[in-house]
Amino acid sequence: MEQAVHGESKRGQVTGTHLTNDISKAKKCTVIGGSGFLGQHMVEQLLERGYTVNVFDIHQGFDNPRVQFFIGDLCNQQDLYPALKGVSTVFHCASPPPYSNNKELFYRVNFIGTKTVIETCREAGVQKLILTSSASVVFEGVDIKNGTEDLPYAMKPIDYYTETKILQERAVLDANDPKKNFLTAAIRPHGIFGPRDPQLVPILIDAARKGKMKFMIGNGENLVDFTFVENVVHGHILAAEHLSQDAALGGKAFHITNDEPIPFWTFLSRILTGLNYEAPKYHIPYWMAYYLAFLLSLLVMVVSPLIQIQPTFTPIRVALAGTFHYYSCEKAKKLFGYRPLVTMDEAVERTVQSFHHLRKDK
């Protein structure tokens, strides 16, 4: 009774407090996986745009006094809840690296962990959940030219990573519930690269140092999307900000790329030559490369009871290097005004400059 009386006498003051809390909460977010490559760039852009940022991850990847870190297991709701309580938006970009080839780990983190994220968001009163998905959820190793979000999920995903990203994306989009003020969206980037990239550039340079970048698969004309990391982050933030204004965006996936498809081998060559390595000069017909990779995969299956081999030359890697796969951003442009912030030329230049420690001496 006393509470009711006090609430009645201070109604204006309490309402004002709620408004202040709502305004401050709207600019407070948590980045799950914020210690990773994409996550760190996301934290930086969010801070620049005036957000208060929490990071949840299995380890603290950097120091920043403006960021509150929460360390824990993504699948443990007790670990996760403190990082999500009191925030309006959650950006979920945590995932094992695609090349890890650990099916159980992918399933646990990408699917089970994401279900835990959804449940915890609801418990904590989070209003928006933006997932980092992947354009590969629709790719099956055959050409995709200017693919839209209407393409069906891959019936035969190219790897365990993609298989679990499909499960993850479906779970997040199905969780969209405007009636309960919980809105979700998925961002599908493709070929993320940029400063501090732990995968594409280091792996490419390592292959070049070992003499494995002398050949290109196919005629070198197949167009592919590579996306600068800052453009990927920009797409996430735009989606979140427009999701609060237009609930009709909820429950949808959006392709986010540089909107400049580039021949696969041209892109790799620009990185290589920018760091003083030779670009591939010789062509292997696509059909021949695929056939050889297929035979190798059969050999690996035959000897697998005796010896475990992880071949790097696989049919799906041949397909990734030799097919067209680029995607339309028209949906993101139309619904939340996405435009790449950084052009491909500038993105490649900045990326090469950031990896000066990998440069080959002339």
From Swiss-Prot:
Superkingdom field: Eukaryota
Membrane topology, as annotated: Single-pass membrane protein
Assembly and oligomerization: Homodimer.
Residues with N-acetylmethionine modification: M1
EC number annotated for this UniProt entry: 1.1.1.170
InterPro entries, per database record: 3Beta_OHSteriod_DH/Estase, Lipid_A_modif_metabolic_enz, NAD(P)-bd_dom_sf
Protein name, per record: Sterol-4-alpha-carboxylate 3-dehydrogenase, decarboxylating
Main location: endoplasmic reticulum
Residue ranges of the TM segments: 287-307
Keyword terms: Acetylation, Cholesterol biosynthesis, Cholesterol metabolism, Disease variant, Endoplasmic reticulum, Lipid biosynthesis, Lipid droplet, Lipid metabolism, Membrane, NAD, Oxidoreductase, Steroid biosynthesis, Steroid metabolism, Sterol biosynthesis, Sterol metabolism, Transmembrane, Transmembrane helix
Keyword Cell wall biogenesis/degradation belongs to the record: no
Natural source organism: Mus musculus (Mouse)
Gene3D superfamilies: NAD(P)-binding Rossmann-like Domain
